[in-house]
């Protein structure tokens, strides 16, 4: 059969059922699905042979070689009168040869002189090769007798449809190393191999037709042990066998390409050789090249890579990865050359839900890095800012030049203390001005810087004073004041003692390693006890010189001006004795923004304290994420200043935006550099803010996060950056309950604009204006959109009102209050209303439509029952008091005499 055949056609041809054919194919190791499936030609041929139908294709042979091969051998073999199945078996490949995809010029006769002929085929092979001179002796016919006529047919081992020669039988394979790779589909296996002829029926192997031993020595790669191995070579280009006659047919020998004596299947260059399997690759197992060291190393590293959350990730081997605070998974993946999606999936499997571009907290980055054996270092903002400046060849915090370039500068003194202890009054007395009257509520809500010339030992010496707020909401301002100062004056009221903000100011000063001079104020008031103040401050390591310590105490009265000169003298003595107050004025200026605000006419205005160098008009400056050029400088008296030396506070005009309070100020060469530094700081600030404000949601608390929560959105506007910052921190510090959240969606310096109103309208927010008012048509727009704008001038009023608003947003909590009890004395039945209970009120009040529960033998029978109707003397009443009888109906009918009805109500409880 030249092509594919279906199973049911083969069954019809062989005269058996399709099930028998399928069973036989299964025994032979062929997987065939159904009777309508097709099988290849070699499989069909083996199937016919197994059913005894292998002689059907024999009449197709019409050449002389087949007839000559059909002749029995002369000396040995089957009897003359016996049927000759074996010669037909030899002639069968001749019929199949033209069907193979080889050139038709290849004759069928060379099938006989195969390099390893079976014993039954050797006489026929010798006769077929007779016309050519053969120096090698012919094989001995008697050594290998053919199969007996009655012997069972042995199906061929190979099933290669492209082979040009098919032996009738194969001897036992020679011992050789097994070939790599799995056996071919049509090859012999222990499960489908037919029984071999007995060893006694086979003589010793005759010599090869080519004569001497095959070059190369060892077993032929295409030998009998290879399934499907015949005379066919492995690849194209095979030549004539070594021992083949000169004029013999080409391709007489088999072997690999390039091997001496290797013959091709067809003997023609460029022709495809025989395949090892029925439908397999040419030549059997594929040729495998050796892997490079790089490929092996990559494969090994991939196998050794850690698996985090079911995802295979790179192995860090303890490598240190530096990430900025608020970095995203994309930034982390870029550092370790990984796929961001893999990091997202790994975190998700670990219970953390983030996106690739979302800012991630420090703990999450360190956790993920530890799983991959990376050491993640989250760079602090200070280190990151230093690295940013180093990238522009800039430094901050160091004086340029040597010791000879340093000049003495005035001391910077910060006045600190509890609220209403007299700090601003003291500064007013020193400056001979009145600053306190300008503050709302009599408390300082801004930070101010002034320079005052003080006469000391006949010499006028300047001192820079920084006034910080004492209210508890201005912790950050006090911290900034302590960092920018040289000496701290701690003001303590003699009649009030040490207060919480006093302790906080001490901690700020000690943390900044700043010497403290204590000013005991209000000694002129009744009840003043300076000795008590000295005793209290010893608990905080502030021991007076009178007690053997090194802290200077001065008793003053800011209102009366008592001992002010002694206080200034103590400040100067401390500065001269304990501090090295020198700076280089001949360098580009560096300083700190003490305060900043937005002025309607002048734009962003920053109060800057110069720490080193000289700031001049026209310099390119950058402070935090704000940059610009100095257009104007004004001192504390409102006069223009052309240059500011170290320790000089000035107001700088020329920023493009309002800098943050406490930002470092730096002079650069070009506006371009200032803009680049500001842009990078702004991006870093946004990432850090996003990482801080993002609430981590894990898979465990996902259900709780999805529950409905109340949220109060706020927009903060103030007159300066420090006040807005303090107000935001104070509001975010209000702790009410998890059910209510406070969110500041926008903040800024300046008046309330229409943009703020539109944002508040879109997000249902409340606008808080601190010392500012609405601009232009913002008020009309707010009234039209229904936006609530609250104005405050004292910070604690804003905090109290926002806290009250948050409490009002809490879900109400109800508590149960018992109203009274009634005992059922009689039962009445009505077809309209059901059971009617005749009751006696034993305590309290029974009220109509009140909640009730039914008790029977002090056991609750029914809960959440409602008193649907209530009557007294045939009149409908609202309530019945203690000692009276009544009739009532419940929404529960299973009542009995002796039951007790307990009425109660739920009252809303105030949340605190």
Swiss-Prot record:
Residues 408-579 form the tr-type G domain. Coiled coil: none annotated. GO terms for cellular component: cytosol. Residues 56-74, 121-131 have a biased composition (Low complexity). Residues 219-283 have a biased composition (Gly residues). It is found in: Cytoplasm. Residues 100-120, 132-152, 173-183, 192-218 have a biased composition (Pro residues). Residues 417-424 are annotated as: G1. It holds the Pfam family EF-G_D2. SUPFAM superfamilies: Initiation factor IF2/eIF5b, domain 3, P-loop containing nucleoside triphosphate hydrolases, Translation proteins. GTP binds at residues 417-424, 467-471, 521-524. Residues 521-524 are annotated as: G4. Keywords: Cytoplasm, GTP-binding, Initiation factor, Nucleotide-binding, Protein biosynthesis. Residues 287-296 have a biased composition (Basic residues). One of its GO terms (molecular function) is GTPase activity. Residues 557-559 are annotated as: G5. Residues 467-470 are annotated as: G3. Belongs to the TRAFAC class translation factor GTPase superfamily. Classic translation factor GTPase family. IF-2 subfamily. NCBIfam families: IF-2, small_GTP. This is Translation initiation factor IF-2.
């Amino acid at each position: 059969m030249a092509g594919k055949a279906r199973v049911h056609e083969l069954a019809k041809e062989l005269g058996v059922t399709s099930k028998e054919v399928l069973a036989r194919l299964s025994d032979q190791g062929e997987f065939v699905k159904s009777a309508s499936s097709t099988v290849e030609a070699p499989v069909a041929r083996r199937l016919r042979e197994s059913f005894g139908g292998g002689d059907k294709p024999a009449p197709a042979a019409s050449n002389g070689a087949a007839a000559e091969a059909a002749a029995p051998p002369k000396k040995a073999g089957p009897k003359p009168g016996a049927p000759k199945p074996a010669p037909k078996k030899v002639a069968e490949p001749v019929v199949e040869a033209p069907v193979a995809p080889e050139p038709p010029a290849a004759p069928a006769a060379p099938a006989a002189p195969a390099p390893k002929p079976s014993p039954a085929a050797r006489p026929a092979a010798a006769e077929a090769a007779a016309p050519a001179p053969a120096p090698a002796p012919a094989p001995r016919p008697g050594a290998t007798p053919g199969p007996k006529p009655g012997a069972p047919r042995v199906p061929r081992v190979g099933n290669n449809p492209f082979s040009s020669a098919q032996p009738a039988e194969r001897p036992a394979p020679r011992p050789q190393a097994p070939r790599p790779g799995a056996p071919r589909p049509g090859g012999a296996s222990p499960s489908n191999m037919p029984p071999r002829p007995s060893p006694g029926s086979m003589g010793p192997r005759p010599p090869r037709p080519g004569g001497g031993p095959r070059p190369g020595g060892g077993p032929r790669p295409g030998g009998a042990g290879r399934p499907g191995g015949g005379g066919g070579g492995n690849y194209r280009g095979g030549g004539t066998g070594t021992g083949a006659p000169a004029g013999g047919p080409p391709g007489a020998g088999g072997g690999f390409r390039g091997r001496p004596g290797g013959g091709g299947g067809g003997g023609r260059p460029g022709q495809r050789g025989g395949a090892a399997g029925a439908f397999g690759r040419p030549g059997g197992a594929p040729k495998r090249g050796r892997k490079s060291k790089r490929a092996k190393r990559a494969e090994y590293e991939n196998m050794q890579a850690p698996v985090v959350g079911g995802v295979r990730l790179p192995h860090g081997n303890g490598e240190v990865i530096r990430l900025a605070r608020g970095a995203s998974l994309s930034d982390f993946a870029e550092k370790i050359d990984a796929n961001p999606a893999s990091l997202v999936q790994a975190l998700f499997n670990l219970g953390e839900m983030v996106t690739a571009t979302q800012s991630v907290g420090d703990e999450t980055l360190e956790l993920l890095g530890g799983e991959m054996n990376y050491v993640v270092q989250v760079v602090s903002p200070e280190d990151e800012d230093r690295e940013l400046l180093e990238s522009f060849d800039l430094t901050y915090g160091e004086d340029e030049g040597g010791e000879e370039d340093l000049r003495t500068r005035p001391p910077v003194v910060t006045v600190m203390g509890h609220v209403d202890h007299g700090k601003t009054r003291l500064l007013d007395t020193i400056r001979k001005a009145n600053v306190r009257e300008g503050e709302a509520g009599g408390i300082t809500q801004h930070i101010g810087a002034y320079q005052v010339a003080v006469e000391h030992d006949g010499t006028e010496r300047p001192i820079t004073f920084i006034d910080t707020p004492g209210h508890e909401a201005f912790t950050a301002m006090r911290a900034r004041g302590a960092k920018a100062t040289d000496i701290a004056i701690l003001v303590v009221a003699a009649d009030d003692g040490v207060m919480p903000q006093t302790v906080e100011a001490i901690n700020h000063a000690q943390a900044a390693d700043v010497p403290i001079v204590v000013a005991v104020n209000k000694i002129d008031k009744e009840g003043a006890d300076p000795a008590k103040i000295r005793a209290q401050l010893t608990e905080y390591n502030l021991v007076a010189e009178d007690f053997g310590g090194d802290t200077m105490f001065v008793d003053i009265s800011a209102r009366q001006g008592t001992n002010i000169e002694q206080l200034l003298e103590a400040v100067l003595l401390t500065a001269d004795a304990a501090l090295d107050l020198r700076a280089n004025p001949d360098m580009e200026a560096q300083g700190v923004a003490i305060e900043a605000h937005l002025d309607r006419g002048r734009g962003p205005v920053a109060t800057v304290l110069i720490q080193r160098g000289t700031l001049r008009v026209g310099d390119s400056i950058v402070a935090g994420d704000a940059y610009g050029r100095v257009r104007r400088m004004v001192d504390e008296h409102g006069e223009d200043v052309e240059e500011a030396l170290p320790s000089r506070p000035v107001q700088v005009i020329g920023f493009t935006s309002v800098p943050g309070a406490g930002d470092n100020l730096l002079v650069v060469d070009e506006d371009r550099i200032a803009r680049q530094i500001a842009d990078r700081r702004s991006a870093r600030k946004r990432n850090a803010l996003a990482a801080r404000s993002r609430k981590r949601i894990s898979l465990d608390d996902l259900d709780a996060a999805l529950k409905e929560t109340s949220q109060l959105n706020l927009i903060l506007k103030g007159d300066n950056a420090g006040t807005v910052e303090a107000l935001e921190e104070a509001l975010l510090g209000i702790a009410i309950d998890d059910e209510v959240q406070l969110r500041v969606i926008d903040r800024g310096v300046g008046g309330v604009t229409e943009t703020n109103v539109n944002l508040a309208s879109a997000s249902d927010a409340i606008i808080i204006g601190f010392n500012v008012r609405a601009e232009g048509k913002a008020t009309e727009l707010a009234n039209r959109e229904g936006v609530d704008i609250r104005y405050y001038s004292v910070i604690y009023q804003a905090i109290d009102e926002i806290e009250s608003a948050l409490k009002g947003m809490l879900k109400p909590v109800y508590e149960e209050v018992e109203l009274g009890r009634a005992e059922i004395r009689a039962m009445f039945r009505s077809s309209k209303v059901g059971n009617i209970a005749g009751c006696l009120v034993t305590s309290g009040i029974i009220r109509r439509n009140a909640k009730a529960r039914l008790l029977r033998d002090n056991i609750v029978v029914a809960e959440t029952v409602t008193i649907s109707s209530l009557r007294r003397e045939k009149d409908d009443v609202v309530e019945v008091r203690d000692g009276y009888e009544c009739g009532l109906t419940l929404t529960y009918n299973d009542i009995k005499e002796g039951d007790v009805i307990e009425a109660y109500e739920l009252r809303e409880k105030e949340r605190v």
